[in-house]
Amino acid sequence: MDKIFLHGMRAETLIGVYGWEREHLQPLIIDLDIGVPEKAAEDDDIGNTVHYAEVCETLRRQLKEQDFLLLEALAEYIADWVLGCFGAVWVRVKIVKPGILPGVREVGVEIERDKDKD
């Protein structure tokens, strides 16, 4: 398995449990590490890997239309989407919600999911 990564992707979505968080889209910083088959490296063919520009563009668009209470639920949504739509075999999703707590630079969540596990 090879890995591609997209780190520091900025996106916005409606997320949070407090009313003031739900008044506007909240900024997020997302890191994705995506496990892909070695075929792309062997064939030098973008058709055999995850097209990261497509992942970024599509994910940003989808998140603007979604609604989550918890970062954990958002991370699970992203992991399921990457595994289901892009032929990935493994994914690590890290989401940071910057500046949400006074005196704390960032809070967030990180999950890993494997396509072969339930």
Question: Residue spans of the language-model regions?
Answer:
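N-terminal, polar/charged subdomain of small-to-medium soluble alpha/beta proteins
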Residues: M1-D118
